[in-house]
């Protein structure tokens, strides 16, 4: 159940950022890919999906993420969503269609 929600969030965000899932789950610091991953963390934690599940789902996609990175990404995404109405609209739309 949580895996399907995670997959929906990941696909939706990748689509919005015009990147592939492979790009989203690569070890890169490119800003738009980092933003995409951080928004994924924010959506999952707000759902709520346990951090241990998020970590496992990311690992299943080839991306090793630490708990501190999840926390930092969540906080960064929260600031981004609070300051940019376009990101706020995007995550709201994704959340409204996640069932």
Predicted regions and their residues:
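Conserved catalytic core of nucleotide polymerization and phosphodiester-bond processing enzymes
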Residues: 10, 19, 39-40, 55, ...
């Amino acid at each position: 159940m949580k895996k399907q929600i995670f997959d929906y969030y990941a696909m939706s965000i990748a689509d919005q950022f015009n990147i592939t899932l492979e790009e989203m789950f690569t070890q890169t610091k490119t800003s738009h890919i980092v933003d995409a991953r951080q928004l994924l963390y924010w959506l999952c934690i707000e759902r709520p999906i346990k951090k241990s599940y998020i970590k496992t789902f990311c690992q299943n996609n080839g991306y090793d993420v630490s708990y501190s990175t999840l926390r930092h990404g969540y906080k960064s995404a929260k600031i981004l969503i609070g300051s940019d109405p376009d990101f706020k609209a995007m995550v709201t739309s994704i959340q409204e269609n996640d069932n």
